[in-house]
Structure formats: C-alpha cells, structure tokens
Swiss-Prot record:
Organism of this sequence: Rattus norvegicus
Coiled coil region boundaries: 68-110
Matching CDD domains: Cby_like (cd07429)
Highest taxon of source: Eukaryota
Transmembrane segments: none
Region Minimal region for the interaction with PKD2: start-end pairs: 60-112
Residues recorded with modification Phosphoserine: 9, 20
The protein's role, per its UniProt record: Inhibits the Wnt/Wingless pathway by binding to CTNNB1/beta-catenin and inhibiting beta-catenin-mediated transcriptional activation through competition with TCF/LEF transcription factors. Has also been shown to play a role in regulating the intracellular trafficking of polycystin-2/PKD2 and possibly of other intracellular proteins. Promotes adipocyte and cardiomyocyte differentiation.
Note: 'Chibby' is Japanese for 'small'; the gene was so named for the RNAi phenotype seen in flies.
Protein name in UniProt: Protein chibby homolog 1
GO CC terms, sorted: centriole; ciliary basal body; nuclear speck; nucleus; sperm flagellum; trans-Golgi network
Length: 127
C-alpha cells in the first residue's frame, strides 16, 4: 500500500451555476441609459476642501486653490518657472563650453611651456 495514496486527492467540485448578482436586467432601457450612459461628464473630486476637475489629462482646481492663489496666477507662475528653467539650462551649457575652452587653452599652454623648456635646454647645450 503506497504511503500517499488516493486518500489525499480530493473530489472535483462541479462547476457553479452563474447567477447574476446585478439587478440591471430588471431595469428598463431609459433607466439603464441614465445610470450607465456614455455621457459621464467631467470627473470631479474634493480633496482637502479643494474641488478639482479632470480636464485635458490634468487635474485642475475648480475655482480657487487653497491659499488664495487663483488659476491665472498658477499658470503665470508655471510659465515663469518654465522660462527660468530654460534660462538655467542655457547658462549651464555656456558654463560647460567655457570650461571646455579653458581646459583646451590650459593644455595648449602646458605644451608650449614644455616646448619652450626643451628649446632652452637645447640652446644651453650648444653654448
């Protein structure tokens, strides 16, 4: 007699009958369209006392942002922030270019110093 025989294999359970838990089938067509229609409107939510709407892929404050700053002010600040970031990137690029120029000039200066030292040594040997 095997140690682990058929004692441990359970019987297969019969499949369950599908019973709809929804009462949508009992509603008439107009009520279903009203409840589940395609016109959902814009999604809105209230978060920390602030009403937000989902427009064009972004959550936007419905009226006034907490702290008294309105929508136009935030747009102006975002635009100014974008301008400052672009200016910052341009200035970083200029600094990188200037550092490259400085390192190139320094390398050329060291090469010329070496050449000058070698010429001095050869000139002293001739005398």
């Amino acid at each position: 007699m095997p140690l682990f025989g058929s004692i441990f294999s359970p019987k297969k359970t019969p499949p369950r009958k599908s019973a709809s838990l929804s009462n949508l089938h009992s509603l008439d067509r107009s009520t279903r369209e009203l409840e589940l229609g395609l016109d959902y409107g814009t999604p809105t939510m209230n978060l920390a006392g602030q009403s937000l709407k989902f427009e064009n892929g972004q959550w936007v404050a419905d009226s006034v942002i907490s702290g008294g700053v309105d929508r136009r002010e935030t747009q102006r600040l975002r635009k100014r922030n974008q301008q400052l970031e672009e200016e910052n990137n341009l200035l970083r690029l200029k600094v990188d270019i200037l550092l490259d120029m400085l390192s190139e000039t320094t390398a050329e200066s060291h090469l010329k110093d070496k050449e000058l030292d070698e010429l001095k040594i050869t000139n002293r040997r001739r005398k």
